[in-house]
């Protein structure tokens, strides 16, 4: 009798296991009309915030993205008041309805000389952050840069 009860319980458990599995994936499929490098291309103007040993300062400036190939974009960082003028290349991809890009090479091969990452939301707002070492007078200082701008 015990064996019969165990068999029935095992069959019921197995049956409930398959009943519990279902298609819960109701996520909409996003169809993009442009590739990531084409959709993200443009000039984004806004404010740079530079933080370092000498405090925090805010400057106006821009970042320009230009398509460089499949999933690649040329990035130009421009902030004359903070002596920032650098060019680099980054990987770029779709992220939900916006874009993300980054370059993790922190060497002189990367024109910025530091790794960086950024995000562009569906409204065209860009956020970028990185830390670099810059010479001010005779000393080298480490500064953290953050950019917030709009296309």
What does each model-identified segment do?
Residues 1-8:
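Bacterial N-terminal signal peptides that target proteins for export
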Residues 3, 14-41:
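Bacterial Sec-dependent N-terminal signal peptides
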Residues 30-32, 129-151:
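Edge beta-strand at a domain terminus
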Residues 36-59, 149:
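Tryptophan-anchored aromatic micro-motifs
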Residues 54-94:
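N-terminal glycine/threonine-rich, aromatic-flanked beta-hairpin/loop signature
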Residues 54-56, 79-89, 107-114, 134-142:
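Short, surface-exposed beta-strand/loop "edge" segments at domain boundaries and coil↔beta transitions
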Residues 61-67, 90-92, 114-121, 146-149:
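Hydrophobic/aromatic beta-strand elements that line small-molecule binding cavities or substrate pockets
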Residues 99-135:
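Acidic, glycine-rich flexible loop segments
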């Amino acid at each position: 009798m015990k064996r019969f009860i165990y068999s029935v319980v095992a069959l019921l458990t197995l049956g409930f296991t398959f009943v519990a599995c279902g298609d819960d994936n109701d996520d909409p499929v996003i169809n993009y009309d442009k590739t990531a490098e084409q959709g993200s291309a443009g000039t984004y103007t806004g404010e740079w915030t530079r933080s370092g040993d000498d405090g925090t300062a805010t400057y106006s400036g821009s970042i320009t993205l230009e398509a460089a190939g499949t999933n690649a974009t040329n990035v130009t960082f421009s902030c004359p008041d903070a002596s920032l003028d650098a060019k680099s290349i980054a990987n770029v991809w779709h992220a939900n309805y916006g874009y993300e890009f980054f370059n993790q090479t922190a060497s002189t091969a990367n024109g910025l000389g530091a790794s960086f990452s950024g995000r562009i939301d569906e409204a065209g707002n860009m956020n970028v952050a990185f830390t670099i070492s810059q010479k001010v007078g005779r000393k080298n200082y480490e500064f953290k840069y953050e950019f917030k701008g709009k296309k």
